[in-house]
Amino acid sequence: MGFINLSLFDVDKLMVWVSKFNPGKILSAICNLGIDCWNRFRKWFFGLNFDAHMWAVDAFIPLMPHYTEQMERVVDDFCSETPESKLEDCLELDTSVNEFFDEEVYKKDEEGVMKLQRSAARKHIKRVRPGMMQAAIKAVETRIRNRHTIFGDDMGKVDEAAVRATASDICGEFKINEHHTNALVYAAAYLAMTPDQRSIDSVKLAYNPKSQARRTLVSAIRENKAVAGFKSLEDFLGGPLSFPVEDAPYPILGIPEIRVAEKRASRVMKSKRVVGLPAVSAGLKVCVHQTSLHNMIVSLERRVFRVKNSAGELVVPPKPIQNAFDSISYFREEWLRKLSHKGQILKSSLADVVACYSSEKRKLYQKAADSLEKKPVQWRDSKVQAFIKVEKLECDTKDPVPRTIQPRSKRYNLAIGQYLRLNEKKMLDSIDDVFKEKTVLSGLDNRAQGRAIAHKWRKYQNPIGIGLDASRFDQHCSVDALKFEQTFYKACFPGDQQLETLLKWQLSNTGSALLPTGELVRYRTKGCRMSGDINTGLGNKILMCSMVHAFLKETGVRASLANNGDDCVLFCEKGDYEQINRNLEQWFLCRGFEMTVEKPVDVLEKVAFCRSQPVCIATQWAMVRQLGSLSRDCFSTQDWLNPKTFKDAMNALGQCNGIINDGVPIHMAQAKLMHRIGGNRKFNLDALHKQMEYSWRDRLGKRTNLLWSEVEDATRLSYFRAFGIEPYIQRIVEEYFSQVEITCEGRSTNVLPTHYSRIHKDLIKAR
């Protein structure tokens, strides 16, 4: 029996005719013709104008048949709880394993002095209880299914490898012996890759005609439904979208150190907006703080004057104990010896310092240099002019406090830059020489950083990586800490009175901030790093590296440090973690710094450094930016509503990210899409420099070729270990990026919905 060609009839007349019959009998007759006829009817039905035929929705939708199965049974099966043994209940201590490790504890000796003592402690290795192997296999299988998204015939070899890696990780978490781990990985992994009855039922539930019909209805309605002021969802997602910035949701504390002067004449300033690409983003909420009186006061209160203690109370930053840095002075002497082998440290001319800058900055610094030729630097040049940093922040988990940049005048920066700017590389290299390996990783591209971190990892037999979280490092730089840092500079230029004066002005700061609305905020601080100082990066590296070196020396722990200012990761043997965890926080607190020892990781790809993680790309290690970058790169405070500016930005982002992420899953696909939106233009260094003035050198190194290399299976597996995104999901997202179409026509809205992207934020989420 054939199916009537409904397109030959007048739809309105046909629907009036259909309405006279029983809708249930019509659907039954169509279903009896077969699934092809049913799908054709469904496609025609949902192409109707529902506003004119709303009765059809009410009549037909409740009667959509289950077609092949009674789906109520499937739902009941899902809801019925079948008790299964927990993995921990299937395990017991394996007494046959005689493996020990050196346990280190501090104990008082006979004289009452705390000394490090080592003793052999048995490793707590477990095995599967007799008769419970089947239950243990089922428990591991369940855990695998909960961590992975898809199982079926479309799984490739790399997907199978990812499943086996997950099974191995589960056994490692529970410290199961090697023999039983081998059995569990082999059995549980392949069981998990074989669809069970629940997997089959879930497919039935998702793809039965009734479920498909409802999804089609939702899609049809969305095409005609207004979203956030737009005529449809497609219109909302189709191009760059502008929305306003907001104030940070924190109350003002009203501390006396901050004063607000009477309102002056306000400047004419256009309200800043953020422009994003909803269709290309990975779905995270991205916010930018506006320059307002509220944000300025909140930032100064919580990033300059007050910190949170362990009880969550806002208090003044901790002070170091007396003579806290005396025990670290040896590091300075050793550093000076290494520095002496790198040639003479000379004061630069103003012209040489000005030449370090480019573009508009060079013009401003040249003007300051001309001024210094006529009038020497004065104390008033060291005054701080603060402003709110315009940065893209991830606001899904918490609302960050606005950041304040606190620069001094360009006259002051040039004066102190004569001593430090051109000598900085030698000073940083000398830190590496003290550690006897590459330690300060700033200035390296992502591949060089990846190689350095992999080298540190391979130095140890049972390696772990320990992140050191220096909470608000600039805020915790006390007067004593800054004085200790300054001894490094003074030792390079002994007896130089001008340098001593310039450094002294950094110990006591007078700051102000003029807001666009006319308010003038004034404040004073003793100590505290001013984030706009020319020696901020160098000083933070000197302080952090010297303190970590002294801590390791005092405790006798053999470890390697990766440092980039206040970003630190320690690499050491697994057995040394407890000693570091037990002593480091108190050791740093005595010197005025609040440090948190993060949970150690025993997989190289899980090491987080400067918001990046190592991934093995075609046998070469490289640092890949964490998943939040997939959202942040899709937002800007530039005028992306202007088609030319938008295409130039997309071209620059696509080129830069395409080079640093060549051969990387998902990241390269997004970069390729951006490059396509930008017109697939050839690499242009000048255009890239214009768009990314501050970071392109460090990002690209010497690479200037867009290769778009094919993603290798081994890279997908390494990417999975780093971020937990299964290879199957990687390919789905890449396919989406290859097909999405974006217009350059910009639009505006007053609010960005919580789930604004086609890619839900939970899909590309580190696990």
UniProtKB/Swiss-Prot annotation:
GO MF assignments: nucleotide binding; RNA binding; RNA-directed RNA polymerase activity
E.C. number(s) listed in UniProt: 2.7.7.48
RdRp catalytic domain residues: 463-580
Keywords tagged on the record: Host endoplasmic reticulum, Host membrane, Host-virus interaction, Inhibition of host innate immune response by virus, Membrane, Nucleotide-binding, Nucleotidyltransferase, RNA-directed RNA polymerase, Suppressor of RNA silencing, Transferase, Viral immunoevasion, Viral RNA replication
GO biological process entries: symbiont-mediated suppression of host innate immune response; viral RNA genome replication; viral translational frameshifting
Variant or mutagenesis effect after changing residue 179 to A: More than 90% loss of binding to the Y-shaped RNA element (YRE)
Keyword Membrane: yes
Keyword rRNA-binding: no
Catalytic activity: RNA(n) + a ribonucleoside 5'-triphosphate = RNA(n+1) + diphosphate
GO cellular component: host cell endoplasmic reticulum membrane; membrane
UniProt-listed SUPFAM superfamilies: DNA/RNA polymerases
Family the entry assigns: Belongs to the tombusviridae RNA polymerase family.
Its job: RNA-dependent RNA polymerase, made of isoforms p88 and p27, plays an essential role in the replication of the bipartite viral genome composed of RNA-1 and RNA-2. Replicase proteins p88 and p27 interact together and selectively recruit viral replication templates as well as other essential components into intracellular membranes for the assembly of the 480 kDa viral replicase complex. Mechanistically, isoform protein p27 binds to the Y-shaped RNA element (YRE) located in the 3' UTR of RNA2 via a direct RNA-protein interaction and to RNA1 in a translation-coupled manner.
Protein name, UniProt field: RNA-directed RNA polymerase
Species, as recorded: Red clover necrotic mosaic virus
